[in-house]
Amino acid sequence: MSELSRFFIEIAERWQKRWKESRVFEPEPTPGVAKYFITAAYPYPNGAVHIGHGRTYLIADVLARFYRHMGRVVLYPMGFHYTGTPILTIAEVIAAGDKTVIEEYMEIYGVPEEEIKKMGDPLYLARYFHNRSKMAMERFGLSIDWTREFTTIDPEYQRFIQWQFEKLRKKGLIVRGRHPVGWCPRHSMPVGAHDTKDDKEPEIGQWTLIYFTDSEGLTFPAATLRPETVPGVTNLWINPDAEYVVAEFDGKRVVISRDAAYRLSFQAEVKILREARGREFVGRSVQNPVTGEWVPIYEAWFVDPRVGTGVVMSVPAHAPYDYVALRDLGIEKLIPLIKVEGYGDYPAKEVVERMGIKSQTDPALEEATKEVYSTEYTRGVMREDVTERIGIHLQEPARSMLRAVFKMYFAGRPVREAREFIAKWLVEARLGGVMYDIMNKPVYCRCGTEIVVKVLEDQWFINYGDPKWKETARKLVDEMVIIPGEAKAHFFATIDWLDKRACARTRGLGTPLPWSSGWIIESLSDSTIYMAFYTVIKKIRQFGIRPEQLTEEFWDFVFLGQGSADEVSKKTGVPVEALKAIREEFEYWYPLDSRNSGKDLIPNHLTFFIFNHVAIFPREKWPRQIVANGWVLREGEKMSKSKRNVLPLDRAVEMYGPDPLRATLALAAEVEQDLDFRDAEARRNAQQLMAIYTLVQRLIQNAENRPAGWIDQWLIAEISRILDKAREAYEKVRVRQAAVEVIYNAKAVFDQYLAMVEKPTKLALEAARAWVVAMEPIVPHIAEELWALLGGSGFVATAPWPRLKAESAALLAKRYVDMLIEDVKNIPAFGPGARRIVIYVNRNFSWAKAALNGDVKTVVTAGAPPQVAKRLIDLVKTLGDEVRTLLASTEQFDELETLKSYKAYIERTLGTPIEIYSVDDPSAPDLGGKKRAALPLKPGIYIER
């Protein structure tokens, strides 16, 4: 710990103690006063929270603190997510003595060996990291109301979740049936993002299997995502060196890779008959089930046996990889299938040639493939003559009947429609099948086992595929504020593809499914409306309500207003006054004003949050805003346990101090961007905060009780502008922009002010107090310290947002002085040897204002001589937008008084004595004709050498 970090930690500990003693962040409903209810995703205590969590929690805290300044009653609570397998899996691995995991926990989290030994108990592990993470959040300075803290295995929470699930079931949104899910073979259970290493969501995709059969009756199921291209197949590809098997599958003897047989075994019955190398099947001919053509099997080392079935169909006219591979073999057989405006018959060939791709190893092949596939899918139409290739092996009238079907539903149809038709037709005709796969493989369970897709029977699902439910979810996304705005498209896309999702497991911590024993509600399903639970748990405890009293009637009354307090009291034994108080608490705080999380949770938690709110609550209780921030890197690299570069939040606080850490997480990137946390930046920000502390001390020590001048008014005006910019940035959740204004730009203004005055005035202390309030959401501890030094009353955390009286004339005065100094420096006579500078001021400010409209007559009417009016109009045109705006908004401005006020500053800046005269002063000498040349806003300048 450096001396600087120790300085900030000591200040933070002092103020955190006072906050806690004063219960300043434990709000109560205040009728008639607007509230602001914000939450951030509660953490899993399977490890200590790190700076990635810290960023999300900081953004929420900045908003919470800002809205306190705006007069809102603010609630920012926190809980801990014990549900699911993450805690259980880590405990099992530690209990088994896994050296890698144990070393990770000791090295990254600094867990002592004696504590590691106890972590084979999952609840001990959870409590350890729960307590440590809570302490880290407190030391980080989060303004959390800890009186509402809970865990997801608390009995009160479990009764709440069971009520939610009964509601979903009664609405027909929970179903039981057959569906593909991500699956851990070791634990024999479905998995989601929170069950996997690095919280990676298993993305389940569907291959269409097309059955090509040889003369011996062996079937080669080619796996494809583009079944509409099967009429254009010229050959199949098989990896000659890969391991394949002959197996019984779907009533056929099939040839597939050994890996595919393993993956398929979780979806259907697969019986391996024998093993073989791929080369055994190279050179055979197989029949296309759609066209009837016989096509050869070629060898190809690019075929990955872990993808699909290890059998790939080749469509060189529409697949760049296939085209290049066949070209390398000296074969060019192209069958056109799809018409796309702007392309010829063979898009794959065209794109390959345009990109100059010479070999199968050219990285540009991937780009070429994306272009062809995307363009054909979005703009492509199947050729009308494709029907001529259908069923050539069939006898009449079967051939004509089949071609008629393809003419109606396939030929001339958009690619997306043709794809849907043929995939369905192949399965119904028993000429193909379906295989599910993890498309973003490899994905690993936290136990280390690779995830596969299993088709489950009798599994409980939340049916996110329900069309009406999807439509209601879309309405909420459309209405609510989502930051960043471009994330709305991501939410809409997620709503579109979401389908049934397994909602229960047979192992792990959590809430039992209320109607089916042996099932535990999984972690991404019990964490969708818990924000409502924060509003009531405090009073549930205060009134001593037992878990068994938290019945369906209780929750219906509290959250939905159903039934009367008297009726519910009779059924539950909960006192009427308790029921009413809890209902009032919920009514005051809900709806949620802002939900804060990482962008990686958009495809799951955040979208489930939307779905479940619209299903459970009436429209007026739907959430109002989601903030989805980017990831946190460390020194340019993704943080991961394997790299040993995860930085726990408590360690980061110890290294830098809480406020420098907060400043760095705020300043390094805007909310929607990924943030690269760098040690050098954190240390630079610590120096900046120390400089702010020193500057305010200097202001306090040197402030004089004298009348304020133009320079003091300029300070007030500039800080007022910064306050306006910061307020707007906070309101728009532009946290970086706000931090730049209050930590760097405001400091620069004060530095400039102190450079212009010999002694600051008491007005400067008023500006400093306003500044401290504005910086408090970012760096609250140093703000409290400075607030106390500046004589502020109470906590700065609860001070109202400052209002400074900003005079545009003060800003114009400073810009005027800057322009004058620049003009002097541009005069050739200025420099070493200059003895004095004589400045002549034309005080007819009304002429300059009149010149803004560019009309000579208007300027003359204001009193200017005609020859002066034209010069003045030309001058005003050269002024920048800022000066012209200030000129328009300023009613009175005295150039003479301004220069007198700034005289000492101008002399110090130029290093030369100055004399100031008004052109109206008859006793003033006209040196070099500069007196009569002076214009409003453009003084005459004479330099004597």
Curated annotation (Swiss-Prot):
GO biological process: leucyl-tRNA aminoacylation
Reactions listed under catalytic activity: tRNA(Leu) + L-leucine + ATP = L-leucyl-tRNA(Leu) + AMP + diphosphate
Binding site for ATP: 641
CDD domains membership: LeuRS_core
Keyword annotations of the record: Aminoacyl-tRNA synthetase, ATP-binding, Cytoplasm, Ligase, Nucleotide-binding, Protein biosynthesis
A Pfam family reported for this protein in Swiss-Prot or TrEMBL: Anticodon_1
Signal sequence bounds: none
GO CC term, one of those recorded: cytoplasm
Compartments (UniProt record): Cytoplasm
Short sequence motif 'HIGH' region: positions: 43-53
Keyword Signal: no
Enzyme class: ligase
E.C. numbers: 6.1.1.4
Residue interval(s) of motif 'KMSKS' region: 638-642
Family of the protein in this entry: Belongs to the class-I aminoacyl-tRNA synthetase family.
Protein name (database record): Leucine--tRNA ligase
Phylogenetic placement of the source organism: Archaea, Thermoproteota, Thermoprotei, Thermoproteales, Thermoproteaceae
Gene name linked to the record: leuS
